[in-house]
């Protein structure tokens, strides 16, 4: 331990690629037919396989990456089918209909938190990992806006609630705590 009243860290940010390039022109071992076969397997993922806020987010992320690969390979049919699946599922989570019992968010006033139901990995009982769970949904929203410009106009308010639940930057936010999941080292 060192004694002091402050410290400083500095990291260099090198940027993030939104997607990797199509490898056909960069690798002799690359086999497009293998990739098309994998796309076919993933594009037919049924909604019945999906389970809870965490695992469903992971599956949406897998579909997002597959749609990006299909797009790079000019497999527009597969890309659009996957986008439709992502859109259907994401919008189902972002809405509530009377008597709906699954795939929804609700606000718990006692805990000042959004809860996804069905919840996974203690997201409801321990109020943990919202930045992971909601991060998948936020990523899916960014993906939707990239491929369906204007999507955010209809759904942005709900996406902003997810962002605020995980990391509200407003110290006076009436719904969520300030920087719930903030880590200066993350």
List each model region and its residues:
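Inter-helical turn/loop segments and adjacent helix faces that build the functional surface
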Residues: 70-77, 144-154
